[in-house]
From Swiss-Prot:
This is 1-deoxy-D-xylulose 5-phosphate reductoisomerase. Homodimer. NADPH binds at T10, G11, S12, I13, G36, K37, N38, N124, E126, G215. Mn(2+) binds at D150, E152, E231.
Amino acid sequence: MKQLTILGSTGSIGCSTLDVVRHNPEHFRVVALVAGKNVTRMVEQCLEFSPRYAVMDDEASAKLLKTMLQQQGSRTEVLSGQQAACDMAALEEVDQVMAAIVGAAGLLPTLAAIRAGKTILLANKESLVTCGRLFMDAVKQSKAQLLPVDSEHNAIFQSLPQPIQHNLGYADLEQNGVVSILLTGSGGPFRETPLRDLATMTPDQACRHPNWSMGRKISVDSATMMNKGLEYIEARWLFNASASQMEVLIHPQSVIHSMVRYQDGSVLAQLGEPDMRTPIAHTMAWPNRVNSGVKPLDFCKLSALTFAAPDYERYPCLKLAMEAFEQGQAATTALNAANEITVAAFLAQQIRFTDIAALNLSVLEKMDMREPQCVDDVLSVDANASEVARKEVMRLAS
């Protein structure tokens, strides 16, 4: 039985992870749950899964959780703060850590799990976008096993040979017969919109994703294809891929989640319903398989599958991300931070849709691109880029 810590248990990935546990109580036991401020959901999770520990981000939330659990007769020990989250990620009895805390808050707990040599089910995008080199160096030193949860990276992982899976981030693709990795994306809701009309697109229009249901921030990232740009950065680190070994493809139906092209002409793809429980269950059970609760893909109901190359005039954010990777971790960190500010400004109707890419570029041009040497350096770049982005938004919005 695998012992599990879930970082970010009350978020959507955390809830889906617990659903997989629910379907497979004989395979998984929850040791620790870590969350932000959602006490109500954490109470429900603690009562159902009886973890030894529950950690809330702040003391007030932890106090409330403790009171509510005691009233219900729960014996779960309640803790608070980032150090407690890091401790849960490194617990001796834990085999697997689901790293699903969103944003910079997830960096140190994920790094703690890596340094403790755990199997890390990686769902925190920022880990590799901002700390790719730092994290991959730590993986090598501690011999931790990274398993990607993101549907595209998980699809690539499943389509790669075992020697690469067991030495993720360091195995040589070419030596293992791999020519390239094909990263697919839907192209978002504005795939067919005339370029001249993009400036007038509203937040509500940007948030109507055709295939996946997701939050407003990531919906906008899908519309700009910044999400694919960030996934490109992650894939370069995860699979030790050069620029020439990466292809980005628009695949509007989102049925093929990504592919791998081999030297002999074969292309291996992973298909499935667009449901995050599939990649989550895959990483949890790897190298075995368990029931995820996802309905089987019905091939008879599929429409034609189509593919196209991305147009960088339509998706300048994608190009920005690809170029930022070549500049280093300071650039990818700054781009990610700037994008959070510009997307929030677009959602608040302070700037136009087309201003997102323009402002992201403007921030990159103003930043000091010295390579960060530790997580604190990364957080400093993140904070500086956010500040520059806020000023750029104010300049444009005034």
